[in-house]
Amino acid sequence: MKNNWIIILVLVIVIIAAVLYLIGYFMRKKNQEQLDELEVRKEALFDLPVFEEIDDIKKMHLVGQSQNSFREWNQRWVELSTRSFAELESQIYEVENQNEIFRFMKAKKAVVEANETMTEMEAEVEVIRNGLKELRESEERNSLEVQKALDVYEELSKSLKDDKASFGPAYSEIQKQLRNVEIEFTQFVTLNTSGDPIEAREVLEDAERHTYELEDLMKRIPPMYEELNETFPDQLKEIEEGYNQLLADDYVFPEQNFAEEIQHAKKRVENSMADLEKTEIAAVEVANRDTATAIDALYEVMEREIEAKKYVVTNQKIIDDYISHSLKNNRQLMIELDHVSQSYTLNNNELGRSRGFQTEIEEIIRRQKDLEPRMKEHTVPYSEIQAFYKECYKILDDIENQQLEIDASLKELRKGEKVAQEKVDEYEFRLRSIKRYVEKQRLPGLSADYLEFFYVATDRIEDLSRALNKMRINMDEINRLCDLCEDDLELLDKKTKDLVNAAALTEQMMQYANRYRHTHENIRAALDKSMYLFSTEFRYQDALDEIGTALEAVEPGAFKRIEDFYFKNINNPNLTAI
């Protein structure tokens, strides 16, 4: 039994030893694998072309802030590749040592620390490389800008040499400024080489700025010089020669200082040329705009007088004829007005207006006579004559239109008289027709109101007839009377129809109401009163209202039924009183 326990104990120890061995083996293997991975990462890190990237940037000859940035990134790389690398190597050695002596837990901790160091180094390298990349790209861009400025400078030098004549008096100043730019670029190279990056950068910025300013200057000067050297002188010469020729051709200019304006423009060109020599471009641009405006104004004055002469030559005879035509028409109009005024009253001041036309035409003739000697002596500008002619056209056109209007109104007077005479005949016929119509009804009589209105209408027609038979007819009064007669007859016609219809309806209502005379006292009384109003006072509408009201009280709807029947058969003499 004791031997069995010994065997079991030995087996347990063997098993435990085996398990511990296996655990140690696997832990050692795992630590070694992590160590191998760490070695791979370390090799990969130091295989990165950081040294080459740093060397490439060194060759770029950085200056100023760029050089400071590069020094910072380079220092961080030096620290990483020395101090951090040494620390990493120490940690790797520690892992290997602990792993060899089976201190697996310490080895594992050392592996973790080494991995952390490795991760930090990888992150730092990434930051350094990105910084170097950005610095390189920035410098490449700057180099391109510098090269671009140098290319512009070279182009400007070539342009100045090839197109010397296009810069005129500004050539010397431009050449001087170009030489200054060249000196600045040379100074930049010297300072950059000698190791003064800050001042070198400032000089470079000045050189670039002056280069582009000079480029702008050299673009703007040639067109300005062309204006001052060719365009303006040629135009002023043309204006001066044209002005002298126009004076020789007897033109007169209202502008007394025309020749002085030419000299002022010439002087402005001279001053601008002096400013151009000093490359005072802003002043030259303003002056050239003013000069161009002044020259345009001079051209405009000459063209105005040339066009005015053409207008005067074309319209001179037309104006003379037009004045004669207007004068003749007005005389004829005044004769016609005098003749018409013997038969008609003129209500629109036609005679006064025609006398006003005469005064206006005579004023035009007077002004024309004042101009004639000045035109012959060539002491008046054509533009002044043109303005007078245009004013004449406006006045004469207005007179012509009013003359035609008055002439048409005179013709309308005769037409109006004829129409009014026809209306008198028509009104008299309508009045007689109404009278015959009323007589035909055989009414017992007519009310005073109706007769009064009938006589008013009759008197109005007689007034119209008398107005038409006067020695001088007032057509305004006649037209007013015509309108009143028309209104009177329309109203009389309505009153007549109302009167006749009321009388006829009263008779029918009374005839119908007789059936109730003996049975209804109110009907009997209404019949008596209605008969009195009808036969004695001839108030047919009142009689109708009286009997109609009583009948409606006895037999509702009877009044409306009889009225409807009457108007439905009003044109049937067998069924109605009419």
Swiss-Prot record:
Regions annotated as coiled coil: 103-165, 256-285, 394-490
UniProt superkingdom: Bacteria
Biological process, per Gene Ontology: division septum assembly; septin ring assembly
Localization: Cell membrane
Transmembrane segments: 9-27
Annotated membrane topology: Single-pass membrane protein
Zinc recorded as keyword: no
A Pfam entry, by short name: EzrA
Extracellular side: 1-8
Main location as per UniProt: membrane
Any one of the GO CC terms: plasma membrane
UniProt KW keywords: Cell cycle, Cell division, Cell membrane, Coiled coil, Membrane, Septation, Transmembrane, Transmembrane helix
InterPro entries, alphabetized: EzrA
Topological region Cytoplasmic: 28-578
Function (record text): Negative regulator of FtsZ ring formation; modulates the frequency and position of FtsZ ring formation. Inhibits FtsZ ring formation at polar sites. Interacts either with FtsZ or with one of its binding partners to promote depolymerization.
Family classification: Belongs to the EzrA family.
NCBIfam families xrefs: PRK04778.1-4 (NF003410)
Protein name: Septation ring formation regulator EzrA
